[in-house]
Amino acid sequence: MHPILNIAIRVARKCGNILIQYYDRNKTNNEKQILKKDFITKIIFVLEKTMIDMIHKSYPEHSIITYHKNNKIFKNTEIIWLINALDGIKNFENNLPHFCISIAIIVRKTTQISVIYDPIRNELFTSVKGQGSQLNGYRMRCKSTNTLKRSLVGLVYPCNNSKFQNYFFTIINLLFSHEVKLRCTGCISLDCAYVAMGRLDYLFNGNLIPLLFSSGSLQIKESGGLISDLNGGHDYVSSGIILIGNPKLMRVILVKIRELFQNNLK
């Protein structure tokens, strides 16, 4: 096993155990909302400190960027850890058992290692660039679905993307016309992992946050999936819109989207 991957897995599992303990306490926490917010803030602080301490114990020269507190610890720009201590925070806050810990390791500006850990289901998704994606040690591949009809589609609403909202419901109607089943899970990292291992056929994300997506994107690519914007290009980081699926299904969807908007997408 890659030595950095081994440390990333240890970090994810350790924080997963902490999350479970807090989750059990949160289920019996009936305090007022403001006190609950303080409780969540404390959890994030504990998790991020644990992750940073564990990483720097093994790799003191590595840089770290955290999502929730936006901590940026720059020591070595060659290797950067992007850590999201709790992806699916709203689910956690409302006792919905669908959240995870997400880690991406960037080496010379390229994502080389990804770890996504779901402590509720004890599912560990790992990827190493050029070596594939795995779930609990078993190889993952995207589904080979080549039709939209009755497919299962993950969906992220474009709440911060007013430009895309003009297209959103039109595309949703297109999906409904093919009898697709939509799932809005509230956890983008697990959405990506689920496409990578075939639980979801396709993911339609109109609210891309690059720091949240780095780990999931490697899982997708290493399981044979494709990522594109609405035009079939790779401008999804600047546009904030991503389409994810296997190559056959992606071709079908992109053709239908082009027909729908008559090549007027910008």
Swiss-Prot record:
EC number(s) on file: 3.1.3.25
GO biological process: inositol metabolic process; ribosome biogenesis; signal transduction; transcription antitermination
Presence of keyword Cytoplasm: yes
Record key words, sorted: Chaperone, Cytoplasm, Hydrolase, Ribosome biogenesis, RNA-binding, Transcription, Transcription antitermination, Transcription regulation
Residues that, per the record, bind substrate: 86-89
Any one cellular-component term (Gene Ontology): cytoplasm
Reactions mediated catalytically: a myo-inositol phosphate + H2O = myo-inositol + phosphate
Protein's UniProt keywords contain Lipoprotein: no
Subcellular location field: Cytoplasm
Molecular-function GO term, any one: inositol monophosphate 1-phosphatase activity
Cofactor: Mg(2+)
Pfam families: Inositol_P
Assembly notes: Homodimer. The rRNA transcription and antitermination complex (rrnTAC) consists of RNA polymerase (RNAP), NusA, NusB, NusE (rpsJ), NusG, SubB, ribosomal protein S4, DNA and precursor rRNA; S4 is more flexible than other subunits.
Functional summary from the UniProt entry: Part of the processive rRNA transcription and antitermination complex (rrnTAC). The complex forms an RNA-chaperone ring around the RNA exit tunnel of RNA polymerase (RNAP). It supports rapid transcription and antitermination of rRNA operons, cotranscriptional rRNA folding, and annealing of distal rRNA regions to allow correct ribosome biogenesis. This subunit may play a central role in organizing the structure.
The protein's name in its UniProt record: Nus factor SuhB
Organism placement in taxonomy: Bacteria, Pseudomonadati, Pseudomonadota, Gammaproteobacteria, Enterobacterales
Record gene name: suhB
